C-alpha cells in the first residue's frame, strides 16, 4: 500500500506561509473588484458610462464629476465640485430641474453623440439637447472644471458646460450676451442651499455702454455694480484704482456682443464666483485651509436697486437712509414719513431750460449744476462720446434734456436724460456727479457762502494784522528777519502762480518749514534726489510732511518747479503722491508733500535685509499699482501726462505699501488726443530712457512704458540697474538671457520663491520685455499693459530688446552725469 510522504515541521510551516500569501493576493483582487467602480474614469463614452458611486476627475485632480445628494436626500444630481475639499462645494449641476429619484442612473453618450443622463428604467432625465449625428464622441473633465463633449474623429469640441452655466463662474468661464444671435448667458441661483433647481435670482451683463453687472429678482433689477471703468466697477465702494480686479470685460458695440470673464485670483487656483440663493454675488478663494470671502454684494439696504425711488439719495451712514437729492422734495410727504420711499422725489423748482425749448441752449445762463462727491452714479446713463471733463460739462449744459453728468476715470463722460434712480452716497470712494438745478436753488447757498466768506476773511485779516505785529516785535528784539508769514517775496511768487492755474495750492512760510524740519537738520533728511534733498517735517498740528528742497544749485529751475506744482495740483489718484503746498524764499524753492512712512521703493528693494519685507505678492501689488497710476496719467486724467522720469526711487510707499508715483518736475502734459511730442532738451535717468527719447527727444506714452518695463524688471530681480553695467552687461541683456533659458522664472530672488508663483513671475518678465522693445509700436499701450497685468490672456512673444554693454569705467555710472543733451542721472537713494 502506497503511503503519502510525511512532511516535516519545516515543510508544514513553508506550506502554511505560501497559502497565507495566496489568500492575501486573492483577497486583494476581490477588494479591487469591489471598489473599482469608485475610481475616477478617464472619460465617458458609449461603452464606459458614469454610474452612481463613480466619479470622473480632471487630469490635475482639482475638479471631480459625479453624483451627489444635497443634505443626504434621496434625490441624486450630476454635478462638478472641488475634489478633496470639505465641505463639498458644487460648481455646476447638469439636471437642476429634474433629480434622479431611482437607485440606478447612468451618464453616457447617446447614439446621436449627445451627453445624456438615464435612470434605471432608461428614461432620459437630462441631456445636452443637441444631436451631433455621430456616437463617436466622448466626454471629459478639463483642468479648468469645464465638462466637454469631443468628437473622436475631428477632435472638435461639440459642447461645453462653461457655455451652460449654473450659479457659479470659474476662472476662464464667462457671462455674456450676443444680441444678433439672441444669446444671453447668465448665472442663476439655486432655489435653496439644498435645492439646486433654478432660484429667483440671476446675474447678467447689461448691453449698456459701458456695461454693468446686474442681479435680477425675477424680472426686476435687484442690485447693480455700476458701469465698468476699464479695471473696476465704478459703483462698488472700496474697489478703486488700487483694487486688483479678477474680471475682464470685452464689449463690441458694433457687433452687439460683450463678455464678462473671471480670471484666477493671482496665486489661488481654487477660487470661484457664485450667486447665492439669497441673491448675493460672492467671490471666494481657498488658501489651502479654508474658503475666504474676497467680495460680497449686496451688503447694505442702500445696495438694493431703487431703494429711495426716482431722484432719491440713499445715504449709507444715515438713519433713515433716504433723502431727496438737492433741489428735490418728497413726492408724497405722508409716504416718506412712513418710511415708504419708493415713490421718490420731484423737482422743487422747475428748470429754465425745458426739453421742448426751440433752442438747445435756452436756459444756459439760468440753470446751474450742483456737484456731489462719493456717490454711486445713477442707472439709465448714456456715454457721451470721447469728451474731456470741460466738454462734458458744456455738452450737458447746452442740452435741455440733460439732468446730470459725470466724468469718470476709466469711462469718460456719462450723461443722464431721464430720472435719476439708484443713487447712493458712500462713506468713502465713489464718483462725482453734477446735478442740473435751477439757479435759484443754489442762490441761497451762494449767499451763505458770501456771508461766511466775508466773516472768515475779516477774521483772517484780524489774525494776520495781529500776527504781523507780533512778528515785527519779535524781529525788532532778535534783529533777525524771520517773519511768521511770507511777505513781499512770496506775495510776488503768489502773483506769478495765478496765471499758472495753481490757485488751489497752499503757500507755506519759510519759518514754519524750518521749524517743522528742525532747520533742515541732517537727522531729518530722508534722502537725496536729482534736484535736491528731501526732509521729514512735523507741523504744529502734528501732521507729518515731506519737504523737497530745491536750491539754486539744483538741476530743477523755476520752469520745472512750476511744472511740478501745476501738474500735481490737478492730479488726484491713489497711486500718485499728494502735494500739500509750496514755499519760496529768495533762491530757495520748497515743495511740501504728504509724508509716506515707508519712503521709497528702492529703500526696500536694494537692502539685503529689508527686501524680505516685500515678498512676491507685495511686489506684484506694487507693479499693478504703478501701472494704474500710469493709466490715470496717460488716459484718465483731464490732461495726458507723460512722466519722463519713472524709476524705482520715484515710487513712494505708504503704510499699506501702496505705491505712489512722485517727482513730476520733468513731466509734460498734452491735451485731447495728442499722443506724442518732442523736445530739444532731453532729461531723464540713464537706463530708464526709451531709445527714441534719448536719441531724438521724441517722448510719448510709449516712452513711459519703456521706463515701466525697466522698473518692473528691477522689482523682480531686486538689483540696481547700475549693478549690471559694472558687470559689463545691461539689465535688459540679463533679463533676455533668462527669458531665453528659463522663461524668466529664475530672475526672482530664490529667497522669495516660497511666496511666488513661477508662472506669474515668468508672465511679469515677459511683460517687462514687451515694454522695453526697441520700436515704440512693439510696446503695449497703458490700457493693454493694465489688461496684461490683471488677466491671464495670452501674451505676444517679445523680440530681443536693444541693449548695449557698458564698461566699468563708463561715464554712465556717474551719479552726477550731465551730458551735452542735458541728461541728468539722479542719485538712487530713499526719500
UniProtKB/Swiss-Prot annotation:
Keywords: ATP-binding, Cell membrane, Disulfide bond, EGF-like domain, Glycoprotein, Kinase, Lectin, Membrane, Nucleotide-binding, Phosphoprotein, Receptor, Serine/threonine-protein kinase, Signal, Transferase, Transmembrane, Transmembrane helix. Residues 1-42 form the signal peptide. Residues 470-831 are cytoplasmic. Residues 43-448 are extracellular. Gene3D superfamilies: Bulb-type lectin domain, Phosphorylase Kinase, domain 1, Transferase(Phosphotransferase) domain 1. Residues 43-162 form the Bulb-type lectin domain. GO terms for biological process: recognition of pollen. Disulfide bonds join 302-314, 308-322, 392-413, 396-402. It is an enzyme of class 2 (transferase). It is a single-pass type I membrane protein. The chain crosses the membrane at residues 449-469. Its main location: membrane. One of its GO terms (cellular component) is plasma membrane. Coiled coil: none annotated. Residues 520-803 form the Protein kinase domain. The active site is at 645 (proton acceptor). Residues 353-439 form the PAN domain. InterPro entries: Bulb-type_lectin_dom, Bulb-type_lectin_dom_sf, Kinase-like_dom_sf, Pan_app, Prot_kinase_dom, S-locus_recpt_kinase_C, S_locus_glycoprot_dom, Ser-Thr/Tyr_kinase_cat_dom. It catalyses: L-seryl-[protein] + ATP = O-phospho-L-seryl-[protein] + ADP + H(+); L-threonyl-[protein] + ATP = O-phospho-L-threonyl-[protein] + ADP + H(+). Residues 609-626 are annotated as: CaM-binding. Residues 298-334 form the EGF-like domain. Its EC number is 2.7.11.1. Belongs to the protein kinase superfamily. Ser/Thr protein kinase family. This is G-type lectin S-receptor-like serine/threonine-protein kinase At1g61390. It comes from Arabidopsis thaliana (Mouse-ear cress).
Amino acid at each position: 500500500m502506497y503511503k503519502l510522504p510525511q512532511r516535516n515541521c519545516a515543510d508544514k510551516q513553508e506550506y502554511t506561509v505560501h497559502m497565507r500569501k495566496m489568500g492575501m493576493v486573492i483577497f486583494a483582487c476581490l477588494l479591487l473588484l469591489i471598489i473599482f467602480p469608485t475610481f475616477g474614469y478617464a472619460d465617458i463614452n458609449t461603452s464606459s458610462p458614469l454610474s452612481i458611486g463613480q466619479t470622473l476627475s480632471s487630469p490635475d485632480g482639482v475638479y471631480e464629476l459625479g453624483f451627489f445628494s444635497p443634505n443626504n436626500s434621496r434625490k441624486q444630481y450630476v454635478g462638478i465640485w472641488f475634489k478633496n475639499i470639505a465641505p463639498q462645494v458644487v460648481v455646476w449641476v447638469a439636471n437642476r430641474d429634474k433629480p434622479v429619484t431611482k437607485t440606478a442612473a447612468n451618464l453616457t453618450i447617446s447614439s446621436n453623440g449627445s451627453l445624456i443622463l438615464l435612470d434605471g428604467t432608461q428614461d432620459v432625465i437630462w441631456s445636452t439637447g443637441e444631436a451631433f449625428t455621430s456616437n463617436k464622441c466622448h466626454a471629459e473633465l478639463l483642468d479648468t472644471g469645464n465638462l466637454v463633449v469631443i468628437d473622436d474623429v475631428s477632435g472638435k469640441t461639440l459642447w461645453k458646460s462653461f457655455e451652460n452655466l449654473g450659479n457659479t463662474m470659474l476662472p476662464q468661464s464667462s457671462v455674456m450676451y450676443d444680441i444678433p444671435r439672441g444669446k444671453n448667458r447668465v448665472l442663476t441661483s439655486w432655489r435653496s442651499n439644498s435645492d439646486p433647481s433654478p432660484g429667483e435670482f440671476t446675474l447678467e451683463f447689461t448691453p449698456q455702454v459701458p456695461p454693468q453687472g446686474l442681479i435680477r429678482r425675477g424680472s426686476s433689477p435687484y442690485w447693480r455694480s455700476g458701469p465698468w471703468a476699464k479695471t473696476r466697477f465704478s459703483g462698488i465702494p472700496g474697489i478703486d484704482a488700487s483694487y486688483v480686479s479678477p474680471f475682464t470685460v470685452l464689449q463690441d458695440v458694433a457687433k452687439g456682443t460683450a463678455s464678462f470673464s473671471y480670471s484666477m485670483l493671482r496665486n489661488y487656483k481654487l477660487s470661484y464666483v457664485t450667486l447665492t440663493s439669497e441673491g448675493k454675488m460672492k467671490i471666494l478663494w481657498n488658501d489651502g485651509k479654508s474658503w475666504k470671502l474676497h467680495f460680497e454684494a449686496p451688503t447694505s439696504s442702500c445696495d438694493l436697486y431703487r431703494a429711495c425711488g426716482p431722484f432719491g439719495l440713499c445715504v449709507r451712514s444715515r438713519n433713515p437712509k433716504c433723502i431727496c437729492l438737492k433741489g428735490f422734495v418728497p413726492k408724497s410727504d405722508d409716504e416718506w414719513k412712513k418710511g415708504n420711499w419708493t415713490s421718490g422725489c420731484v423737482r422743487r423748482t422747475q428748470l429754465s431750460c425745458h426739453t421742448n425749448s426751440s433752442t438747445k441752449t435756452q436756459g444756459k445762463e439760468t440753470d446751474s449744476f450742483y456737484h456731489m462727491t462719493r456717490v454711486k452714479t445713477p442707472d439709465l446713463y448714456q456715454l457721451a462720446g470721447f469728451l474731456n471733463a470741460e466738454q462734458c460739462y458744456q455738452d450737458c449744459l447746452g442740452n435741455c434734456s440733460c439732468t446730470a453728468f459725470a466724468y469718470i476715470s476709466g469711462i469718460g463722460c456719462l450723461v443722464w436724460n431721464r430720472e435719476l434712480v439708484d443713487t447712493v452716497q458712500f462713506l468713502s470712494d465713489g464718483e462725482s456727479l453734477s446735478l442740473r438745478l435751477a439757479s435759484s436753488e443754489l442762490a441761497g447757498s451762494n449767499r451763505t457762502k458770501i456771508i461766511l466768506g466775508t466773516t472768515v476773511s475779516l477774521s483772517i485779516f484780524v489774525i494776520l494784522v495781529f500776527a504781523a505785529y507780533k512778528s515785527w516785535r519779535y524781529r525788532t528784539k532778535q534783529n533777525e528777519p524771520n517773519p511768521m508769514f511770507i511777505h513781499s517775496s512770496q506775495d510776488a511768487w503768489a502773483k506769478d502762480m495765478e496765471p499758472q492755474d495753481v490757485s488751489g495750492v497752499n503757500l507755506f512760510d519759510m519759518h514754519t518749514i524750518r521749524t517743522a524740519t528742525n532747520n533742515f537738520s541732517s537727522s531729518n533728511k530722508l534722502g537725496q534726489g536729482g534736484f535736491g534733498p528731501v526732509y521729514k517735517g512735523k507741523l504744529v498740528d502734528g501732521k507729518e510732511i515731506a519737504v523737497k528742497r530745491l536750491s539754486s544749485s539744483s538741476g530743477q529751475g523755476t520752469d520745472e518747479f512750476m511744472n511740478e506744482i501745476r501738474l500735481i495740483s490737478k492730479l488726484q489718484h491713489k497711486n500718485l503722491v499728494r502735494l500739500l503746498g509750496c514755499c519760496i524764499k529768495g533762491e530757495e524753492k520748497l515743495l511740501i508733500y504728504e509724508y509716506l512712512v515707508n519712503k521709497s521703493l528702492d529703500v526696500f528693494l536694494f537692502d539685503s535685509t529689508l527686501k524680505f519685507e516685500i515678498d512676491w505678492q507685495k511686489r506684484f501689488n506694487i507693479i499693478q499699482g504703478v501701472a494704474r497710476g500710469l493709466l490715470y496719467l496717460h488716459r484718465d486724467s483731464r490732461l495726458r501726462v507723460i512722466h519722463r522720469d519713472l524709476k524705482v526711487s520715484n515710487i513712494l510707499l505708504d503704510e499699506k505699501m501702496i505705491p505712489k508715483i512722485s517727482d513730476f518736475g520733468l513731466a509734460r502734459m498734452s491735451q485731447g488726443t495728442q499722443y506724442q511730442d518732442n523736445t530739444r532738451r532731453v532729461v531723464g535717468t540713464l537706463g530708464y530712457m526709451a531709445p527714441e527719447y534719448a536719441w531724438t527727444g521724441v517722448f510719448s506714452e510709449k516712452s513711459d512704458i519703456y521706463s515701466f518695463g525697466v522698473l518692473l524688471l528691477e522689482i523682480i530681480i531686486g538689483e540696481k540697474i547700475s549693478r549690471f553695467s559694472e558687470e559689463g552687461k545691461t539689465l535688459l541683456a540679463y533679463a533676455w538671457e533668462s527669458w531665453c533659458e528659463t522663461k524668466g522664472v529664475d530672475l526672482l530672488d530664490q529667497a522669495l520663491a516660497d511666496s511666488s508663483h513661477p508662472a506669474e513671475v515668468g508672465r511679469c518678465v515677459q511683460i517687462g520685455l514687451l515694454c522695453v522693445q526697441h520700436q515704440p509700436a512693439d510696446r503695449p499701450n497703458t490700457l493693454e499693459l493694465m489688461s496684461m497685468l490683471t488677466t491671464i490672456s495670452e501674451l505676444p512673444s517679445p523680440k530681443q530688446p536693444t541693449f548695449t554693454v557698458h564698461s566699468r569705467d563708463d561715464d554712465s555710472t556717474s551719479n552726477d552725469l550731465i551730458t551735452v543733451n542735458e541728461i541728468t542721472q539722479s542719485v538712487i537713494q530713499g526719500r
